[in-house]
Structure formats: structure tokens, C-alpha cells
Design a protein with these regions (language model features):
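Extracytosolic and intramembrane catalytic regions of membrane-associated proteins
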Residues: 129-130, 137-144, 148-246
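N-terminal membrane-targeting hydrophobic helices
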Residues: 1-126, 131-135
Length: 246
């Protein structure tokens, strides 16, 4: 989701496709279809909290709308039905596709509204400087939140239906430890920090070894170790192992 999902690629990739396939029905026909398809693809990536460098190469910050999870069954089923119905009724394939995308954008609009409503509710219940709302799998009224005040970070669930919030963890951010700084030099942590929008490092001891664990708080509601980078140091504080988990 780097330069291939940026504004430059949005114009360049359809151009390449149109040049290759343009001899069949014309350059502009394929360019328009490719531009539309690639633009919708980038937009759908932009809807989840993973982050997309949509303005690259002019701006390398990752942006996200935070309104849908990485895999949304409603989107997948909708696309599948659109393809199947279009294959069986080719005369109305364009109409079926148009209705599908109208429903999709209505769906995204509804989720955008619910996210903002939940965020406003959270602000009434929890005092913080910044608030981040993250979508949960197959859920509309319950959202994962990250609330930050200075060096203190609180994460948990905000439920718009029951009008309740549940704080799961409270962290104190501190990345000044020498081992944390050294862990940033490893390949896996560099890759992790490239996409992580809310990274949080923690240190723990296991015998004579020290482990630096980086977590992406936007996905920390998932059980187990997901979206983490881990570096193990020996008793002499030398890195002996590093790993990355999705």
C-alpha cells in the first residue's frame, strides 16, 4: 500500500493497461475502465485502519478512513453476487454493477456515520486529547478505540447500542529505552513501523534474555500475537532473534 496505491499510480497504471489493451476497443475506453476500477480498489483499501499512502509520492504519510475491517463479509458477498448475477444476465450487467456500487457507497456512508456517532459518545464518557476509532470484524455499533492523553494511552471498546465503554488496557508510552531504540534497527521492526499507525513498544524479561515487543494498538483487540514485531536480546544486549506476525 505504498506508491502502487498512490495518486501517481492511479493515473499511471490505467495508462499502461490502456496502451497494452487499447487496440481492441480503443485507448480511452480501457483507460476509463482501468481508472475507475483502480480508483475503487484504492478507495476500498482506504476504508480500513491498515493505512494507505494514497498521496504518494508527494506525501508518504499513511491515511485511513477507519470505517471497515480488512476483510468485510458484506463487501465480499456483494462483489460475488454482482459478478454471478452479471454473468447470468449480461444484458443488465452494467445496471447490476451500478446498483452494487451505489449500495457499497451507501454502506460505507452508514459506517462512517456510526463511527462518528460512537466517537462523539466516547468523548462524552472519556476525557483525552486524541481519539482514534477502529472498526471491528462484522460489527456496526461496537468500535475499538485508542484514546491518548500525553504519554498515557487507553484502549478498549465503545458500544453505541448499550451506551457503555470498556477500557481493556492502559499504557504509558516510553520509547527512550536503549533496547527499544536498538530494536528499531532490525529489519522486521523497520517493516512494522512502516505500516503501523499506533505502535507501542514493551519490554519483558525471559530468563537471561530481554524481549522488545512492538504492538499495533489498532489491532490489539485480536487475541494472541497479531500485527506484532518482536526482537530478542541476549544477556549482553545483542539481538539474537527477530520476528514479525500478522
Amino acid at each position: 500500500r505504498g506508491i502502487t496505491h498512490g495518486i501517481l499510480a492511479l493515473f499511471l497504471v490505467p495508462l499502461i493497461i490502456a496502451v497494452i489493451a487499447g487496440f481492441r476497443k480503443g485507448f480511452f475506453y480501457y483507460y476509463f475502465l482501468s481508472f475507475l476500477a483502480y480508483g475503487i480498489h484504492i478507495f476500498m483499501d482506504l476504508t480500513n485502519q491498515y493505512g494507505t499512502r494514497v498521496l504518494s509520492p508527494f506525501d508518504w504519510n499513511a491515511y485511513s478512513l477507519d470505517i471497515s475491517f480488512i476483510i468485510d463479509p458484506y463487501i465480499s458477498i456483494g462483489l460475488f453476487l454482482c459478478v454471478v448475477l452479471g454473468r447470468f444476465n449480461r444484458k443488465r450487467a452494467a445496471l447490476i454493477a451500478a446498483i452494487t456500487f451505489i449500495l457499497f457507497f451507501s454502506y460505507f456512508g452508514g459506517r462512517y456515520y456510526l463511527r462518528n456517532a460512537t466517537k462523539d459518545f466516547l468523548k462524552e464518557k472519556l476525557e483525552a486529547n486524541t481519539y482514534k476509532m477502529c472498526p471491528l470484524p462484522n460489527d456496526f455499533l461496537r468500535w475499538w478505540f485508542i484514546a491518548k492523553s500525553g504519554d498515557e494511552i487507553k484502549v478498549g471498546f465503545a458500544d453505541l447500542f448499550t451506551k457503555r465503554i470498556c477500557i481493556q488496557d492502559t499504557f504509558t508510552f516510553n520509547d527512550k529505552d536503549p533496547l527499544i531504540e536498538r530494536s528499531k534497527e532490525t529489519k522486521f521492526v523497520k517493516n512494522f513501523l512502516y505500516f503501523a499507525k499506533y505502535p507501542y513498544p514493551e519490554i519483558r524479561k525471559e530468563g537471561s534474555r530481554t524481549i522488545v515487543m512492538w504492538r499495533e494498538l489498532a489491532y490489539s483487540f485480536m487475541p494472541g500475537e497479531h500485527f506484532t514485531a518482536k526482537v530478542t536480546f541476549d544477556e549482553n544486549n545483542k539481538p539474537i532473534k527477530s520476528e514479525f506476525k500478522f
